Amino acid sequence: MSRGLGDVYKRQPVPYTVKVAYSGTKLSGTESSEAKILSFVFDKEVAAVDSLVVGDVVINEESKTITFMVADTAKAEYLTALVPTIEVSEKATVTPASGVAQDFSNGKTVTYTVTAENGTTVEYVASISGNASFYDFESWSYGSTMYPEEQDCPILNGWACCNDAVLLIKKMGALGGITYEGEYPVRPSTDDVHAGEKALLLESVDTKGGNIFGTPVPKVTAATAFLGTFNAFGALGGDPMATTSFGVMYDKQPLKVTGFYKYTPGAEFYNANGELQAGVADKCSLSAVLYEVSSEDETLNGGNIYTSDKIVAKAVFTNDKAVESYAPFELNLEYVKDYDSSKLYKFAVIFSASADGASYNAAVGSKLLIDDVTIINK
């Protein structure tokens, strides 16, 4: 078949010159692909409302979630402008940016996109996981409702303790031939803290033993602090358990109590009769109890706080070994009944340097330090 010149010309390649203009950053192939949120914190120095965040922020790399707790007193309007400070992988960027206020109120979530140096992106979802109460034991006052003229009795604001019982021994002990001029068992520690300037110090003290008008005075008064109320005169009827009313009204479902503690058991352990018990070791007790009530006046005391059929959930930790440096503790409440938000509850957190101190069994000098306690609610 013959071909014309036109066919030949059609089949000849035609050279072209193409010019490409690059914009942006040219990648070398060695750029980092890491796109992580390394730190996500709330600093009250950055924004006052950030002080509503309590405890540690949890960054879960597997689920790519960021969760944190807020104070149980936090109102929704205050949670609309929390300001996280964010640190990401080197040369990565994050959107929304660090230091920008975000709305975490009413269950809202905020999605953060981290872009690596090479353009790889990873998303994290941040949200409030629950609310909590935080106690740093920095707030103390001094005095007594029983004896207003006494100005040296430590009061742990927001908590009850056994100091009034020791004050009563100081004021009335002479009537039973008892003289006690030592320290109060519950007082602030300023030279041994986990954080801040103060911690809660509980030290079981030697109150000599005996009786005042027939009311027993223990050889050792165990140091105890708790959420609830303490009535030193309750023991005048002969029942030391009647001094404690454990728990405060609580409209949330507590899940666990965390914090830090140190412990030194005393060397000499005495029973309720004031007899030295050779070879018996004291132990500290840290506990939490949620129980149902029919009214605000109903309460559990030292005789039934761990045994009542009113108990809905509890956690108890004891230790008879020395803990020389602050160690974390975690009281996970075990529920024996279903929680019902329509019912009334009281919640008690109890710290004691001597676990059986309510029965007057304790060691002189047993010392428990507590700091930075958080009650975490559902």
Regions found by a protein language model. Name each.
Residues S129-A174:
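Extracellular carbohydrate-recognition regions
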Residues K10-I128:
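Predominantly extracytoplasmic/ectodomain segments of secreted and cell-surface proteins
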Residues S341-L344, S354-N377:
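Extracellular carbohydrate recognition
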Residues D136, K256-K262, S287-V289, P328-E334, ...:
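Residues within well-ordered beta-strands of beta-sheet-rich folds
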Residues M1-Q12:
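Single conserved hydrophobic/aromatic residue that forms the stacking wall/gate
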Residues T190-G210:
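Short carbohydrate-recognition loop motifs
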Residues D206-E296:
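Extracellular-facing segments of soluble proteins and assemblies that are Gly/Ser/Thr-biased and enriched
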Residues S295-S342, A363:
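Extracellular carbohydrate recognition and processing domains
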